[in-house]
Swiss-Prot record:
Pfam family, one: PK_Tyr_Ser-Thr
Effect of substituting K204R: Compromised flg22-induced ubiquitination and reduced phosphorylation
Species assigned in the record: Arabidopsis thaliana (Mouse-ear cress)
Protein's name in the database: Serine/threonine-protein kinase BIK1
Record annotation: effect of changing Y243F: Loss of function in innate immunity
Miscellaneous comment: The association with FLS2 and BAK1 is reduced after flagellin perception, BIK1 being probably released from the receptor complex upon phosphorylation.
Lipidation (N-myristoyl glycine): G2
Entry EC no(s): 2.7.11.1
Name of the gene encoding the protein in the UniProt record: BIK1
Resulting phenotype, K106A: Loss of kinase activity
Superkingdom of the organism of origin: Eukaryota
Induction notes from the record: By infection with necrotrophic pathogens and by paraquat. Not induced by salicylic acid, jasmonate or 1-aminocyclopropane-1-carboxylate (ACC). Induced by flagellin (flg22).
């Protein structure tokens, strides 16, 4: 935990997919109703319409027991997250173990990029309210101190439950994986909806937090930005996000729109299905990138079962894995216009959840109908993999 108490700035705009953030660092939030202030979310100021509490630095010192090392529950490139306690009615510090449990993210004092993302987090999460966005309770801006205060998410990040091995982190059961995927999809669909129109830009397992009942919520809005939606796109001169998750068109040209988030969500679905990280340099070279490794298995319903996390054993029906893979395949279309909207993804995953444990009339293991990806040679620089358009029904 020593790195929490030393100066550290983000070394690169892009960070790799392997995160050590126990709390999905840059925790996160929700707020206000389904309306968003029309004011421009500037990089230089906190919007006056942001209805969250402004804490003093001393209040948060008291709430976290003076930011003691044993209060640390997560750390990352921008700082550390501490566990604390507030009185539920007054939001004033209270003794440990009583009142409202909170998570306090303390920004490292160096780095303008970190400050900008801190402001972005407040100005988005202070305006948005949805069951699948982590709640932002307040912030502190005092002298050189910048902190964010969130609701405490008891089960930590999805990353821990998918990838960590050991007695404490049991493999996430299949039905919970489906529930988490649906919750995350609902949160992302809300961000893309009218009048919100927000591009999240950093969907990944470490940014999905789980409460005591394993309800999933999106966190870390430091890279979020307004629209555009539909077929319109921004051209960004600074590509930001996480290797392994970012859409190919965004990586190659900086073109960014809501369908870029959809691609990243497809990568997340593959992680949920396989129990493997989007990018892992500890795997053999041909298996480092999850999408590239999974592509040959996603050509048919029979082969797709070979990529399912073997720790799940007999918890799932074959057609359930096929349906999740089918959603992932279509999200991962190389052509952005061929990807589904997040509303379509929500409907597909809702259907999957509603039918868990109900065998279908056909046997998908014997059915070798193509799921979508086509094999064959393409330009290596493009790494193309094509698929059928997202139709009325996924499978």
């Amino acid at each position: 935990m020593g790195s929490c108490f030393s100066s550290r700035v983000k070394a690169d705009i892009f960070h790799n997919g392997k995160s050590s953030d126990l709390y999905g660092l840059s925790l996160s939030s929700r707020k206000s109703s389904s309306t968003v202030a029309a004011a421009q979310k500037t990089e230089g100021e906190i919007l006056s319409s942001t209805p969250v509490k402004s804490f003093t630095f001393n209040e948060l010192k008291l709430a976290t027991r003076n930011f003691r090392p044993d209060s640390v529950i997560g750390e990352g490139g921008f700082g550390c997250v501490f566990k604390g306690w507030l009185d539920e009615s007054t939001l004033t510090p209270t003794k440990p173990g009583t009142g409202l449990v909170i998570a306090v993210k303390k920004l490292n004092q160096e780095g303008f990029q970190g400050h900008r993302e801190w402001l972005t987090e407040i100005n988005y999460l202070g305006q948005l309210s949805h069951p699948n966005l982590v709640k932002l309770i307040g912030y502190c801006l005092e002298d050189e101190h910048r902190l964010l205060v969130y609701e405490f998410m008891q089960k930590g990040s999805l990353e821990n439950h998918l990838f960590r091995r050991g007695a404490y982190f049991k493999p996430l059961p299949w039905f919970l994986r489906v529930n988490v995927a649906l919750d995350a999809a609902k949160g992302l669909a809300f961000l893309h909806s009218d009048p919100v129109k927000v591009i999240y830009r950093d969907i990944k397992a470490s940014n999905i937090l789980l409460d005591a009942d394993y309800n999933a919520k999106l966190s870390d809005f430091g890279l979020a930005r307004d629209g555009p939606m539909g077929d319109l796109s921004y051209v960004s001169t600074r590509v930001m996000g996480t290797y392994g998750y970012a859409a190919p068109e965004y990586m190659s040209s900086g073109h960014l729109n809501a369908r870029s988030d959809v691609y990243s969500f497809g990568v997340l679905l593959l992680e949920i299905l396989s129990g493997k990280r989007a990018l892992d340099h500890n795997r053999p070279a041909k298996e480092e990138n999850l999408v590239d490794w999974a592509r040959p298995y996603l050509t048919s319903k029979r082969k797709v079962l070979l990529i399912v996390d073997n720790r799940l054993d007999t918890q799932y029906l074959p057609e359930e894995a096929v349906r999740m893979a089918s959603v992932a395949v279509q999200c991962l279309s190389f052509e952005p216009k061929s990807r589904p909207t997040m509303d379509q993804v929500v409907r597909a995953l809702q259907q999957l959840q509603d039918n868990l444990g109900k065998p279908s009339q056909t046997n998908p293991v014997k059915d070798t109908k193509k799921l979508g990806f086509k094999t064959g040679t393409t330009k290596s620089s493009e790494k193309r993999f094509t698929q059928k358009p997202f139709g009325r029904h996924l499978v």
